[in-house]
Regions:
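Iron-associated oxidoreductase/ferritin-like identity signal
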Residues: 1-66
Length: 66
């Protein structure tokens, strides 16, 4: 079982990762609407990467009794 402070910090980081993912998704949508498909694609990839980070930390918490 994780220390409560460590668990709290990991949860805060998960929230930051998901916030970043939504922000990058918003950027992707904007750039796509402007016809800048390269930028849109890059931000979509970044959004997925941030979601992946959040899921790794979530699985870590689940595997450690949280």
């Amino acid at each position: 079982m994780l220390d409560k402070n460590v668990s709290k910090l990991i949860n805060e980081q998960i929230n930051k990762e998901l916030y970043s993912a939504y922000l990058y998704l918003d950027f992707s949508i904007y750039y796509e609407s402007q016809g800048l498909d390269g930028f849109a694609n890059w931000y979509m990839i970044q959004a997925q990467e941030e979601r992946d980070h959040a899921m790794l930390m979530l699985k870590y918490l689940q595997n450690n009794g949280e």
